[in-house]
Amino acid sequence: VVTQYISFYRDLYQIDIRNEIDWNEKQVLLRCYFPVDVHTDEATYEIQYGNVKRPTHYNTSWDDARFEVCAHKWIDLSEDGYGLSVLNDCKYGCDIHNGRVGLTMLKSAIFPNPDADKEHHSFTWSLCPHVGRWQENDTVAKAYALNNPYQATRKTNEGGTLPKSYSLVSVDVPNVIIETVKKAEDGEGTIIRMYECWNRRSK
């Protein structure tokens, strides 16, 4: 059973599709395709701490056999002046070919575990059309927001005061992402892991 909840927003160029699936299939691959009117010969796929461009067409039999590739939180297909970013919160097999974007939602292999993934699944992807390039339209930030949504919590006042806004650490350029902040294991310092996400020089 597949149930989808589609959300449109008045002031946000984003369509969220939440999927609720009760999966009991055997040797079935479930994919979703989005037809797109974007003309380009390459697409951009997020990888760990960066992104990579891959062709949107097949040149060799090896390309033809590779029906999908991996990506992390987002993929983007853009032509000059317009594009579409597709965000996801846990599905990493995808492809962009012949004017359509495909995502693998579920598969039910029989080896090594014949009952793998036979359960309830809940996941979301988002369609984000944009003018210009993905770098100028917060694709990376939107993907992080989908994967790490804000969570409100109640806290009793313990006598201190807080400013209206506060951040432990911040950057002043949009193409540098603070990925991890942790306490050092061999001292009193703090370890901050960050990376540049646009393939651009930065200071």
Language-model segments: residues:
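C-terminal (or distal) subdomains of carbohydrate-active enzymes
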Residues: 1-203
